[in-house]
Amino acid sequence: MNSAVPGTTHDDIAALTPARARERFRAGERVATSGWCPGFTQANLIAVPQQYAYDVLLFTQRNPKACPVIDVTDAGSVEPGIAPGADLRTDLPGYRVYEEGRLVAETGDAREHWREDMVAFLIGCSFTFERALLESGVPVRHLTAGTNVPMYRTNRACRPAGRLHGPMVVSMRAVPADQVAAAVQVTSRFPSMHGAPVHVGDPAALGIEDLAWPDYGDAPVLADGDVPVFWACGVTPQAVIAAVGIPYAVSHAPGQMFISDVPEATWALA
């Protein structure tokens, strides 16, 4: 779903502070956040009842490529350390609600779905390193096209943890063949934002049957000479929840991230 304010341009969203962006989402704007507030950290969200929090924490520790945790709330808290004063129930553009592993609701306001004992995990997002890609001369096709990044469930199993198991999800960016090495080099500096790609080239090697039909996000944009490059993705917990049927969870809508106050440089290796 895309309901950006009419007349909003890329320059407008790039100039926003994270706090102002969160205000707009709180007011009901629903949009993919690639290109928003460049220079600041974006994060995936997965929130579960406290009885499942240790399973999720263990899962993220065993699968840091897909689930690099950058913040965890206390049970019942909706204010993350990476954005003091923010409210995780309202300050993302979109949310998904899962019951017994089934998607039961999509909303722009999660307050009525947020239980008192929820523990929220914020997981680094690859949108954070897109500015660095652009600055190095690597095009970001979905950003130019104004679409959401395509994401795919793969045949790569994550390491099980407690009651959790399931497939890795990846995001895909089409990169000119002569710039793949640069894309790998740039993104490897951001291990807390998924780091270097997990695969370059043939989608079938990841069990992806048709690149044109992603499981999440929008259809890919490719130019002549592009190579598909795949990064581990923070939507992985949603695929895991669907696989194991966790009784209850709230997540971000894929591509509609939490924008924090933390500069991207915080996570960049020298």
Curated annotation (Swiss-Prot):
Name-wise, this protein is: Putative hydro-lyase Noca_0093
SUPFAM superfamilies for the chain: PSTPO5379-like (SSF160920)
Give one Pfam hit by family name.
Answer: D-Glu_cyclase
Give the EC number.
Answer: 4.2.1.-
The UniProt family comment states: Belongs to the D-glutamate cyclase family.
Q: Name one GO molecular function term.
A: lyase activity
Which of UniProt's keywords are assigned here?
Answer: Lyase
